[in-house]
Every structure is written in C-alpha cells, then in structure tokens.
Amino acid sequence: MSSLTVYHENQPEQPLKLLTHAEDIASTLAEVGVRFERWEAAAPIAAGASQDEVIAAYAHEIERLKRERGYITVDVVSLNSDHPQKAELRAKFLDEHRHGEDEVRFFVAGRGLFVLHIEEHVYAVLCERNDLISVPAGTRHWFDMGEHPHFVAVRLFNNPEGWVAQFTGDDIASRFPLLED
C-alpha cells in the first residue's frame, strides 16, 4: 500500500503525519508542488521484459505525459535482488540530490521510497505499482530501493541526457528511516 509519512527535518524519529489513502497523499503532496497519482498499470509485463516492451505496454500513458509536460526522453529502470550493482546503486540514490528538471516515475511493478526534503519538512513517499510521482526540478530528495530491490519504473525526462543529479553533500538521508524489506 502506498503511503506518505511527513517529518520535521530535525525529528526523524517522530512522524508528524502518516497517510495511506491515495487522495490524501495526492492532496498533501500537491500543497508542496509534487504530483502523485494512481494509474492502472493493467498491461501485463513479463519478468525480464525489455525496456522496449515496457514502454510499448504503457505507450498511451507515456505519450500523454510527454504532450502534457514536454518530456523528450523515456527509459525504464528495472532492479531486482539479483542485480550485481544493487548495493552501489542504492548508495548513490540514497545521497540527497536534486535535478535541473522534474523527476517523473511511473511504477509498473514493485516499490521504492522517494524521500523529499522541502523547506523544513521531509516527505517519505512509499511508491508502489500503479503510482506516478513527479518531483519538481530543484527539489532536494533521495530514493531508497531497499536491500533487496524489486521495482520496474518508467522514467521521463526533459533532457536527452536522462538522469543527471546534483548532490547536495548533506547527510540528512542517513538520519531517516529506510525502505524496509
């Protein structure tokens, strides 16, 4: 089940709010400029499906987002517990960073924890299958895929380079709860 946990940035041990209804999650995130929607990921995706197969299965939704927001690059990130670089990738994504463009993810399968550091608050968004999240450009955040990752997500970008992070050097992510496997 998708969820949103809100903390004050200096109190990672004490949540201010815990939400589990999609409408409540979406409205709370909308207040800080983050888009969250539930989509029907009804197209079957076989285990080990190629990037092209995943993109083809969701072509209608992808094209709508591209038209709506001007995204030009689409790819698929797919990680599971057998991935040889899972520990290195997890460590990289767990460092607080920002992007010069929106970070858009549509979860086709599995789950991941997007944690957003906005002003004095931290918003931990557990995204699962059928969740779309769009994090505005410049938003400090990190992502946890867990020790035993399992997710497939479509990513959309405004630039042809794809995922380009600007790391903040802040160790705040180390003080907040991680995705529990």
Swiss-Prot record:
Pathways involved: Amino-acid biosynthesis; L-methionine biosynthesis via salvage pathway; L-methionine from S-methyl-5-thio-alpha-D-ribose 1-phosphate: step 5/6
GO molecular function, one term: nickel cation binding
Protein's name in the database: Acireductone dioxygenase
Site (Important to generate the dianion): 105
Binding site for Fe(2+): 97, 99, 103, 141
Pfam families: ARD
NADP keyword on record: no
Site feature: May play a role in metal incorporation in vivo: 96
A biological-process GO annotation: L-methionine salvage from S-adenosylmethionine
Coiled-coil intervals, chain numbering: none
EC numbers on record: 1.13.11.54, 1.13.11.53
Keywords in alphabetical order: Amino-acid biosynthesis, Dioxygenase, Iron, Metal-binding, Methionine biosynthesis, Nickel, Oxidoreductase
Known role: Catalyzes 2 different reactions between oxygen and the acireductone 1,2-dihydroxy-3-keto-5-methylthiopentene (DHK-MTPene) depending upon the metal bound in the active site. Fe-containing acireductone dioxygenase (Fe-ARD) produces formate and 2-keto-4-methylthiobutyrate (KMTB), the alpha-ketoacid precursor of methionine in the methionine recycle pathway. Ni-containing acireductone dioxygenase (Ni-ARD) produces methylthiopropionate, carbon monoxide and formate, and does not lie on the methionine recycle pathway.
Reactions the enzyme catalyzes: 1,2-dihydroxy-5-(methylsulfanyl)pent-1-en-3-one + O2 = 3-(methylsulfanyl)propanoate + CO + formate + 2 H(+); 1,2-dihydroxy-5-(methylsulfanyl)pent-1-en-3-one + O2 = 4-methylsulfanyl-2-oxobutanoate + formate + 2 H(+)
Note accompanying the cofactor annotation: Binds 1 Fe(2+) cation per monomer.
Record-listed Ni(2+) binding positions: 97, 99, 103, 141
Cofactor: Fe(2+); Ni(2+)
Subunit structure, as described in the record: Monomer.
Residue numbers marked as site, May play a role in transmitting local conformational changes: 102
Organism encoding this protein: Pseudomonas aeruginosa (strain ATCC 15692 / DSM 22644 / CIP 104116 / JCM 14847 / LMG 12228 / 1C / PRS 101 / PAO1)
InterPro entries: ARD (IPR004313), ARD_bac (IPR023956), RmlC-like_jellyroll (IPR014710), RmlC_Cupin_sf (IPR011051)
Enzyme class: oxidoreductase
Family: Belongs to the acireductone dioxygenase (ARD) family.
Family annotation (HAMAP family): Salvage_MtnD
